[in-house]
């Protein structure tokens, strides 16, 4: 059995680490470079960096921060936010990222996934999906809709269909973020995570809602996810990554332990 992954997520606004609830009320909680280094030293399996306002503001990602984070850690590092072209992908990868996460840019231009995969390999292309629960309709039969620009714009796209399409286009991984659960610490959206995990053959990362090791265990088992993205649970010092991994492994889910 492959070890499951724990991935701290750094949401960055104006060069600072922030966190909100359901993509609202973000507060400054520190320096993203220092936080990345701390999580790396604690045993994080990967780090994800999101420039959370780049797409909405129509600008590129903060490459200087990407470079600083990349030079401070020696684990896989994914960046997202403002990745709208293959050149944006190239710039992020050249700055030190191993993977790029496309979200709003891929919704607007799905071919960016296939172009990026052809140039850099599928392993470097992550589809980020921001999803809201809605009443099922003919256009959205799964009851989960794709939203972009930090949840500000509803796209009328079915999340399940989009995940399948992205896999065909060449995405190597999908990060499924429930905006309904984001920052609540009430647990991941397991129905959504399981639905996507069962529908695709590529790894799925569960995102949004971690408040306890049991939530992560559920996402990695009941939800079928390969990895759990976390933020508030470690940003505010409630748990360290060793705490989380030990408890999750004790529940019966294999983790990579480095201490």
Curated annotation (Swiss-Prot):
<dbReference type="InterPro" id="IPR011060">
    <property type="entry name" value="RibuloseP-bd_barrel"/>
</dbReference>
<dbReference type="GO" id="GO:0016829">
    <property type="term" value="F:lyase activity"/>
</dbReference>
<dbReference type="InterPro" id="IPR006062">
    <property type="entry name" value="His_biosynth"/>
</dbReference>
<keyword id="KW-0456">Lyase</keyword>
<comment type="function">
    <text>IGPS catalyzes the conversion of PRFAR and glutamine to IGP, AICAR and glutamate. The HisF subunit catalyzes the cyclization activity that produces IGP and AICAR from PRFAR using the ammonia provided by the HisH subunit.</text>
</comment>
<dbReference type="GO" id="GO:0005737">
    <property type="term" value="C:cytoplasm"/>
</dbReference>
<dbReference type="Pfam" id="PF00977">
    <property type="entry name" value="His_biosynth"/>
</dbReference>
<comment type="pathway">
    <text>Amino-acid biosynthesis; L-histidine biosynthesis; L-histidine from 5-phospho-alpha-D-ribose 1-diphosphate: step 5/9.</text>
</comment>
<dbReference type="InterPro" id="IPR050064">
    <property type="entry name" value="IGPS_HisA/HisF"/>
</dbReference>
<dbReference type="InterPro" id="IPR004651">
    <property type="entry name" value="HisF"/>
</dbReference>
<comment type="subunit">
    <text>Heterodimer of HisH and HisF.</text>
</comment>
<dbReference type="GO" id="GO:0000107">
    <property type="term" value="F:imidazoleglycerol-phosphate synthase activity"/>
</dbReference>
<feature type="active site">
    <location>
        <position position="11"/>
    </location>
</feature>
<keyword id="KW-0963">Cytoplasm</keyword>
<keyword id="KW-0368">Histidine biosynthesis</keyword>
<protein>
    <recommendedName>
        <fullName>Imidazole glycerol phosphate synthase subunit HisF</fullName>
        <ecNumber>4.3.2.10</ecNumber>
    </recommendedName>
</protein>
<feature type="active site">
    <location>
        <position position="130"/>
    </location>
</feature>
<keyword id="KW-0028">Amino-acid biosynthesis</keyword>
<comment type="similarity">
    <text>Belongs to the HisA/HisF family.</text>
</comment>
<dbReference type="GO" id="GO:0000105">
    <property type="term" value="P:L-histidine biosynthetic process"/>
</dbReference>
<dbReference type="InterPro" id="IPR013785">
    <property type="entry name" value="Aldolase_TIM"/>
</dbReference>
């Amino acid at each position: 059995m492959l070890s499951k992954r724990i991935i701290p997520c750094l949401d960055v606004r104006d060069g600072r680490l922030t966190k909100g609830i359901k993509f609202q009320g973000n507060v400054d909680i520190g320096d993203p470079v220092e936080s990345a280094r701390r999580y790396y030293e604690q045993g994080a399996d990967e780090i994800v960096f999101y420039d959370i306002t780049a797409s909405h503001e129509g600008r590129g990602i903060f490459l200087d921060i990407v470079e600083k984070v990349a030079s401070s850690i020696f684990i896989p590092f994914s960046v997202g936010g403002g990745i709208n072209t293959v050149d944006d992908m190239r710039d992020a990868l050249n700055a030190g990222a191993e993977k790029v996460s496309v979200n709003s840019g891929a919704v607007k231009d799905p071919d960016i996934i296939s172009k990026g995969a052809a140039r850099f390999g599928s392993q470097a292309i992550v589809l980020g999906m921001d999803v809201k629960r809605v009443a099922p309709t003919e256009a959205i039969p799964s009851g989960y809709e794709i939203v972009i620009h930090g949840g500000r714009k509803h796209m009328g796209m079915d999340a399940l269909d989009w995940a399948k399409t992205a896999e065909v286009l060449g995405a190597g991984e999908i990060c499924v973020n429930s905006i309904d659960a984001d920052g609540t610490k009430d647990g991941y959206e397991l129905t959504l995570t399981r639905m996507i995990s069962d529908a695709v053959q590529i790894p799925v990362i569960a995102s949004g809602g971690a408040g306890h090791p049991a939530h992560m265990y559920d996402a990695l088992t009941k939800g079928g996810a390969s990895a759990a993205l976390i933020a508030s649970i470690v940003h505010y010092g409630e748990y360290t990554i060793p705490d989380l991994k030990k408890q999750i492994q004790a529940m019966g889910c294999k983790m990579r332990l480095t201490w």
